[in-house]
């Protein structure tokens, strides 16, 4: 089975949306093996008005999520995920060999696949527990999905 991917037109629209909402990105962590959906991660560097990195998935929305019928009017079946990281977070390929720096990328990719694997959906207010810390350098062990407007 081929992975679900955006059409060229959809991908361009998602790239433009990411830049408009989060800022310009030059770095994209391209996924090499895509078992179900193709999930790249865009890295938006800190800026004058934003003292943090933002990582945004690009590909999760190629899969239409199984949103409950009573929410259909809100058009929530497609989404991407974002996470804010401190300005001193290491975001280079060398650092990503260490799980202490890579776990946010792994987390985004894992969450991006959840709706397809579990025939469900993710949206604002959902929580996803992990049961244990994401890496040895953090006590974080669960996710809360929030409206990205709160990043500022």
Give short role names for the model-derived ranges.
Residues 1-152:
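Short linear motifs embedded in intrinsically disordered, proline/glycine-rich low-complexity segments
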